[in-house]
């Protein structure tokens, strides 16, 4: 579980969100990130703990409060929003990848979509070695990215005085990311042998890594004067390393969205197989990312 949630935390979306906090300055921005993640991760923990103790997926736990019909409504809505998340994440990842190697965003949509399908086909329980290698690579590459931002960036930084961001809004943005995993986390804690420890490990790992991503984004905007991570990495000459960060961070995060859409579909129609639906969701998300412009909703 820890590796899965490490992958969820390493995300281009979280880095981009971190850039919005730059007008607060590093110290106040970091305080907002920490407070927001403590609030969000507490709620994330209890949501995951319910599923872990009951041995039920996220949408099955909803039925405990809203009944069978109410649970069906939430399951349908959850599938729809996870399809949307899958499309948006693929779109963002493809744009970032195309900013490094200009081969066309649609090419990267297909590459990212294919890798997500591979992740789902292998299955959560069989991802051990693949995840270990992918997470180790991402860990090393993100440290390299930190060095570029915090040690090779401009000492003058960017003029962000014209941008408005209240402390409360920054806390809200920091709460948003862990909160977004509430309809998903139980899908990955339901089979835990030690519910409290497994859920705590998942949430702590995610919370720490998510804070790290926010800080990378915020630091990028403050110290380099640039909010586009792809441009920062390209200027630093990271090349293939930059591409690997973008692609694998997108895959390891979006995989959870697509797979959980499949798990939620099982709450609607018991005969459906979650991994099969997850693959279909990935295909739909990939096609949507290629066809529809999503700049205004990312």
Name each region found by the language model.
Residues 18-49, 70, 206:
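Extracellular loop-to-transmembrane helix junctions
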Residues 94-99, 152-162, 223-233, 294-297:
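Membrane-interface helix termini and inter-helical loops of multi-pass transporters
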Residues 1-14, 146-152, 159-222, 234-256:
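Hydrophobic, membrane-embedded alpha-helices of multi-pass small-molecule transporters
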Residues 70-102, 250-267:
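Hydrophobic transmembrane alpha-helices that form the core helical bundles
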Residues 22-27, 52-56, 63-71, 190-198, ...:
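Juxtamembrane helix-boundary/capping and inter-helix hinge elements in multi-pass membrane proteins
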Residues 4-5, 72-79, 100-122, 136-146, ...:
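Transmembrane alpha-helical segments of multi-pass small-molecule transport proteins
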Residues 19-23, 49, 88, 92-100, ...:
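Membrane-water interface regions at transmembrane-helix termini and the short interhelical loops
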Residues 1-28, 117-126, 131, 219-223:
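N-terminal hydrophobic signal/anchor transmembrane helix of membrane proteins
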């Amino acid at each position: 579980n820890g590796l899965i949630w490490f992958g969820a935390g390493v995300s281009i979306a979280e880095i981009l969100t971190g850039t919005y906090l730059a007008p607060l300055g590093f110290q106040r921005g970091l305080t907002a990130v920490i407070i927001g993640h403590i609030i969000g991760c507490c709620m994330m923990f209890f949501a995951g703990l319910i599923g872990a103790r009951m041995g039920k997926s996220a949408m099955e736990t909803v039925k405990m409060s809203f009944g069978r019909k109410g649970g069906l409504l939430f399951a349908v809505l959850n599938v729809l929003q996870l399809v949307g998340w899958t499309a948006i994440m693929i779109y963002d990842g493809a744009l970032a990848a195309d900013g490094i190697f200009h081969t066309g965003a649609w090419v990267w949509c297909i590459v990212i979509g294919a890798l997500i399908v591979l992740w789902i086909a292998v299955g959560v329980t069989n991802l051990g070695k693949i995840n270990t290698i992918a997470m180790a690579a991402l860990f090393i590459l993100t440290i390299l990215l930190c060095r570029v931002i915090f040690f090779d960036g401009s000492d003058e930084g960017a003029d962000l005085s014209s941008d408005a961001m209240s402390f409360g809004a920054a806390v809200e943005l920091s709460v948003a990311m862990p909160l977004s995993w509430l309809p998903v986390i139980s899908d990955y804690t339901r089979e835990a042998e030690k519910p409290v420890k497994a859920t705590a490990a998942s949430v702590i790992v995610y919370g720490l890594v998510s804070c790290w991503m926010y800080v990378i984004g915020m630091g990028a905007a403050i110290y380099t004067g640039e909010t586009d991570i792809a441009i920062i990495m390209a200027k630093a000459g990271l090349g293939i390393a930059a591409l690997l960060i973008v692609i694998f961070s997108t895959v390891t995060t979006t995989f959870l969205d697509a797979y959980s859409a499949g798990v939620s579909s099982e709450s609607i129609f018991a005969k459906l197989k979650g991994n099969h639906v997850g693959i279909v969701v990935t295909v739909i998300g990939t096609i949507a990312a290629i066809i529809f412009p999503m700049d205004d909703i990312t």
